[in-house]
Amino acid sequence: MSRVKRGVTARARHKKVLNQAKGYYGARSRVYRVAKQAVIKAGQYAYRDRKVKKRTFRSLWIVRINAAARQHDISYSQLINGLNKAGIELDRKALAELAVYNKDAFAAVVEKAKAALA
């Protein structure tokens, strides 16, 4: 049986990791052992932050809706309560888009919510 030398596969594996670490600072982009750790950690951060991104955007939408709602003399929580009572099923992303880009439509939605609360 012939002997298997692993130079080619090792080089390919190292090259793959070092390419993923391109743009990292110092040894993290040059030394395989350090680069491998950096790439693994980067993957962990990326995975975690894909989940965090959803929370962050939801809170951003709520802040925007609250700011726009208060211009119409109603708080965020009252607005959401009014929308639920009125049977209007707009999600927070859509409400935030209306609040920022289509103020007239948002005002109409707020009036419906106020009417449902009264």
Swiss-Prot record:
Short name of one Pfam family: Ribosomal_L20
GO MF annotation: an example: structural constituent of ribosome
Record-linked CDD domains: Ribosomal_L20
Cellular component annotations (GO), alphabetically ordered: ribonucleoprotein complex; ribosome
GO terms for biological process, alphabetical: ribosomal large subunit assembly; translation
Entry keywords, A to Z: Ribonucleoprotein, Ribosomal protein, RNA-binding, rRNA-binding
Signal peptide: none
Keyword Ribonucleoprotein part of the UniProt annotation: yes
Keyword Ribosomal protein: yes
Family: Belongs to the bacterial ribosomal protein bL20 family.
Protein function: Binds directly to 23S ribosomal RNA and is necessary for the in vitro assembly process of the 50S ribosomal subunit. It is not involved in the protein synthesizing functions of that subunit.
PANTHER family in alphabetical order: 39S RIBOSOMAL PROTEIN L20
Name the record gives this protein: Large ribosomal subunit protein bL20
Organism whose genome encodes this protein: Francisella tularensis subsp. novicida (strain U112)
